[in-house]
């Protein structure tokens, strides 16, 4: 069964007096569109994701905040306590998006010098400790990164509100971490013909992708290029970000931009290369985009986290493409 998530606006992209209302609006659009949840980012330059998650909860009926969790920011107990507190106060479910952290300078600023592979090992230990607490265990544990003694979680979490857990990462280490946790691995996808089947990975699989779909290819590309024009300043920022990132997905996507997009190749990295977003886009007619989505679904992708929507109509356009893709993909 496919699960769709949108993405919440970032505080650095809007004036402070407009940000809260914009979060509420995007969340409400996503809720009305029937999405499972909405991704809430975390990093050193934006507001706290748990406070944003509260705005999402208070602005919607069913939408689940998918909160990005970076181990360097808070103890595993604090994350478990936040999940159970939302359940206790609002009766609502939270999803967790575990991130290892791809921008090394952000980690160094916080005094964290953990290497790339070790950061995924830390994510595994962190997430398994969170899970044990949320399952109601009394936990005594001494690991490589964390140690607790007779720790329990109060208030306890109702079993039906146990969080969905994702691990963000396109590397083998990221997929292995998701498998160890029993989580969904979220990738930044290559074009479908370059992806391999995920059915044997032992972990659920999802992707971050943007979609611009319209009645025909030319109209979709007109919208896409107007929304994401070439930006020399953005290209320079992208190049600088590459130098301070040890993320495999960042390098992979940067190497994929040589083939020009077209009706035959709707996979587009223009927004990524101009530093407007971090995910690839699928651009074209509903049918063109649906064919690409169906190929991903056939490869085992079941969770799709779409980019920040500019308006409610964009979610409706994406829904048409997904509806067609679901009919094309084998049951």
Report each predicted region and the residues it spans.
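Alpha-helix-loop-beta-strand connector modules within alpha/beta enzyme cores
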Residues: 49-70, 122, 126, 320-331
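An alpha-helical appendage that flanks or caps ligand/catalytic pockets
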Residues: 110, 116-157, 192-297
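Short, acidic/polar
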Residues: 15-29, 169-177, 285-295
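N-terminal beta1-alpha1-beta2 module of alpha/beta enzyme domains
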Residues: 1-62, 163
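Active-site mouth loops of central-metabolism enzymes
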Residues: 2-21, 68-72, 76, 159-169, ...
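Hydrophobic faces of well-ordered beta-strands that scaffold small-molecule active sites
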Residues: 2-9, 38-40, 64-69, 94-98, ...
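Acidic (Asp/Glu)-rich catalytic clusters
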Residues: 31-32, 53-62, 83-94, 179-180, ...
């Amino acid at each position: 069964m496919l699960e769709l998530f949108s993405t919440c606006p970032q505080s650095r992209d809007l004036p402070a007096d407009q940000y809260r209302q914009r979060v509420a609006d995007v969340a409400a659009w996503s809720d009305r569109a029937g999405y499972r949840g909405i991704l809430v980012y975390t990093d050193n330059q934006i507001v706290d994701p748990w406070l944003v998650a509260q705005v999402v909860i208070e602005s919607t009926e069913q939408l689940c905040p998918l909160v990005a969790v970076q181990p360097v920011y808070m103890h595993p107990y604090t994350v478990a306590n936040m999940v159970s507190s939302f359940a206790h106060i609002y009766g609502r479910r939270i999803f967790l998006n575990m991130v290892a952290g791809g921008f090394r300078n952000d980690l160094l600023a916080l005094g964290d010098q953990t290497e790339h592979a070790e950061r995924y090992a830390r994510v595994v230990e962190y997430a398994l400790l969170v899970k044990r607490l949320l399952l109601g265990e009394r936990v005594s544990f001494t690991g490589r990164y964390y140690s607790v003694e007779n720790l329990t979680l109060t208030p306890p979490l109702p079993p039906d509100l146990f969080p969905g857990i994702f691990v963000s990462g396109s590397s083998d280490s990221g997929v292995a971490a998701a498998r160890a946790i029993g989580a969904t691995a979220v990738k930044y996808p290559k074009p479908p013909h370059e992806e391999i089947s995920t059915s044997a990975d032992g972990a659920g699989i999802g992707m971050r992708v943007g979609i611009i779909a319209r009645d025909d290819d030319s109209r979709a590309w007109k919208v896409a290029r107007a929304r994401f024009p070439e930006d020399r300043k953005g290209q320079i920022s992208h190049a600088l970000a590459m130098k301070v990132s040890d993320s495999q997905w960042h390098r992979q996507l940067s190497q994929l931009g040589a083939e020009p997009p077209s009706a035959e190749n709707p996979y587009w990295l223009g927004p990524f290369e101009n530093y407007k977003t971090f995910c690839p886009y699928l651009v074209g007619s509903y049918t063109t985009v649906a064919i690409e989505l169906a190929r991903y679904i056939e490869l085992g992708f079941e969770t799709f986290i779409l980019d920040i929507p500019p308006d409610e109509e964009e979610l409706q356009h994406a829904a048409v493409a997904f509806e067609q893709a679901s009919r094309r993909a084998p049951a």
